[in-house]
Amino acid sequence: MKSLHLFSKILQTLTDSTYVNRHIRRLIFCLILLNSKAYAQDIQFSQFYANVLYLNPAFAGSSHQTRVIGHQRLQWPGLDAKYITSSFSIDHFFTKTKSGLGLMMLRDIQGSNVISSTELSLQYSYELVITSKLAFRAGAQGTYASRYVNYNYLKFPDQYTVDGFTGQSTQEPFGYYKVDYFDVSAGGIMYSDKFWGGLSIYHINTPNQSFYGDVSNLPMKVMFSGGYKFNLTNKNNQSKDEDSDITVTPTFNYKSQGKSDQLDFGLYGIYHRIMLGMWYRGIPVKHYAKGLQNNESIVCLIGWKHKGLRIGYSYDFTVSKLNLGRTGGSHEINITYVFNKPPKKKKVLKKIPCPDFK
């Protein structure tokens, strides 16, 4: 977002200079993270439509089965101070109460472990069937988060001489800081078996996440997302086996947090179990400043699905001034498995499948 665009200008200046040591660049990068409060912005996933419990708590139980999702993102591997994010979630639908329950764990490492965070979230959703083809889900989420900053991983300028890094103690204060807080979020989605659209609001209580005892509230984040699935399979050939279908699904995700906003839009298609997709991230008509365009990356996806298993790999091609050659882009992989349990014959409950990542 905006802080990343600002950082791209600084990084370009640093990497163009042959006199700047790679460790000094790493130090400057981490200090930018700490002093600009870039850590106050949330993690973003390119495969937002697949990591549904992170997208909106109302998706908890939306598969009407038990579902497990694993997600891994490696951002900017070409830099010393890269980002590594891992998430794991499990959710289940309770037919009798028309409710979904989800549990999500997230681990994020920034700046080669200088800044890190761990989050544990519990989600609840309720499903309301409006008509035979339309349903609404409302969800809430409570999160316990711990964030850390460790200066021991940094190398400071007074530890360098003309011969390079000395390893001697620095006059800068080393330290390890931690902050814990509770976070509240909520969301809702309207959907049928072909489309979905949702609104989610995160950090409703704007918790204080300062490491140093002052006030640094986490800004509220608002996301609006949706998608529509077009089934291109000949109606005469359509069967109950979704693996044989040919579908195209345009999706979008708009998010706004603090003074920054971003838009992801694109589509993915499924042809006999093979998935291909492409998205653009940015708002090209918007400029934060002269010469500072909101133009971030192109995301390409390849994947495979079979019955309850879905695997997707995506790569972000950086198109901003923080160019691909310096950052190495971003890698992301999602593995989703839905445990398909046959319905009981005693009672048939009206269910509308939500077309998330299908």
Show which residues each predicted segment covers.
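Subset of outer-membrane beta-barrel
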Residues: 41-358
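Cleavable N-terminal export/targeting peptides
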Residues: 1-42, 340-358
